[in-house]
């Protein structure tokens, strides 16, 4: 099996239940004008992350190595979700950067998840060409925040 890129099914259900707060302008039931903290964790090429991955807690085979913190890095959402036509979209406002890491086991997936939520609910799985890093920086550059290329899109 392999990692498969997808917006997770559990995230779609979470949207109806107002589980996630991507910015401080919305007030879901679990917060009071406070944005949740989202994180991006890297997973090995031997993982099987996909649309059915419900949480960070339930995912296995996260990478490990010098300079890498379990759970990954914080993702910055500096702009509010938006929409154009029939598509809503949201993209982190900065690249996702893992600085000065050594990751010798091949990895090819990133799990975006809600670190504020007790269950560490998943949002999406993103895949890329398998990588290793030797005492370097691994950067995931974010696309333009629009209805065509935004990182999270719902049409």
Predicted regions and their residues:
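Small cysteine-rich, disulfide-bonded extracellular modules of the LU/uPAR three-finger superfamily
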Residues: 1-108, 115-155
């Amino acid at each position: 099996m392999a990692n498969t890129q997808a917006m997770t099914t559990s995230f779609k259900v979470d949207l109806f239940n107002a589980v996630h707060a991507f910015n401080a302008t919305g007030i879901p039931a679990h917060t009071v004008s406070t944005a949740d903290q989202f994180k991006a964790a890297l997973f090995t090429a031997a993982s099987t992350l996909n649309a059915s991955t419900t949480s960070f807690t339930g995912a296995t085979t996260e990478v490990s190595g010098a300079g890498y913190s379990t759970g990954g890095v914080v993702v910055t959402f500096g702009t509010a979700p938006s929409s154009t036509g029939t598509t809503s979209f949201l993209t982190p406002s900065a690249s996702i950067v893992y600085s000065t890491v050594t990751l010798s086991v091949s990895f090819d997936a990133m799990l975006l998840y809600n670190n504020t939520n007790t269950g560490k609910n998943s949002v999406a799985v993103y895949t890329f060409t398998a990588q290793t890093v030797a005492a370097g920086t691994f950067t995931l550059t974010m696309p333009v925040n629009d209805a065509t290329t935004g990182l999270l899109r719902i049409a």
